[in-house]
Amino acid sequence: EILRCLVGSEMCIRDRQKNESKGINMNNMNINSAIADTLDIGNTDTEKKTGLIGFYNYTVVLTYIGMWIGFLGVMLAIKDRYVGSLICLMLAGVCDMFDGTIASTKKDRTRDERTFGIQIDSLSDIICFGVLPAVWVFCVTPKISIAFTAIFVFILCGLIRLAYFNVDEANRQAATAERRQYYLGLPITSSALAIPAVYLIGEFTAIHTQTIAALALLIIGICYVLPVKLKKPSLFGEVLLVGIGAVEFCILIAEVLI
């Protein structure tokens, strides 16, 4: 009888140890699962569906198209197709005008998708509204030494502005869902209107395009990083800017056709 009690007691102890071991394993699994969920290990949005790095839905397609048009403008400037290059600059501006609106229609965007949209838009902007205007001015002012200084300042200021904007926009979106009410400094996309205007002023006045192009590029670049608050245009302001752009675009198209 005593032996039976001892055996039974030993079996109870073993069962208790097994249950405790199972409990510890379950706790470890729960902890590991919580850590994986927090770090999002093995389940990143960038690896879903396509298997490729990046995002390829409709929210970023217009940004990709704008970048391609901007690069085409760079190639045209190198080939001395200056008017065609300016047309590409303005078309890239149109793409940039609507890509944010299109992206906002996707209400279920993940945090990664929103962050990617900000980054890819800025990278596209530096090509379209930084490199393209700089290459255009370099090609039309090859013999003016100030052009090199203007080009360097313009690209550097544009790059700094876009990097700062990315940081500021990420902080703003984390704090509020409201739309931006003002810009700090001149938006880099302003070159889509300013550079064609410089060309047209040179074409229809006695001022040489080579003289004003480098100076305008230098001034625009400095304005990119000036800590001046510029309120976003009202509806009237937007219509006015679109109207100015439409006039510039039509004149450039007419020059190509004629």
Where are these regions (language model features)?
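Transmembrane alpha-helical segments that form the membrane-embedded catalytic/substrate-channel core
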Residues: D96, I155-D168, L218-K231
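C-terminal membrane-associated helical module and adjoining short loops/tails
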Residues: K18-N19, N27-T44, Q173-I258
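Membrane-interface loop-to-helix entry segments
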Residues: L62-Y64, D121-I126, Y182-L193
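Single conserved hydrophobic/aromatic residue that forms the stacking wall/gate
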Residues: E1-D15
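Basic, amphipathic juxtamembrane/active-site segments
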Residues: G100-I144
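Membrane-embedded alpha-helical segments that form the functional core of polytopic membrane enzymes
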Residues: V61-Q119, A150-I155, A216
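Helix-coil boundary and interhelical linker segments in multi-pass alpha-helical membrane proteins
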Residues: L72-I87, I127, V131-F152, A197-I212, ...
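Cytosolic, membrane-interface loops and tails of multi-pass inner-membrane proteins
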Residues: T38-T50, F98-T115, Y164-Q181
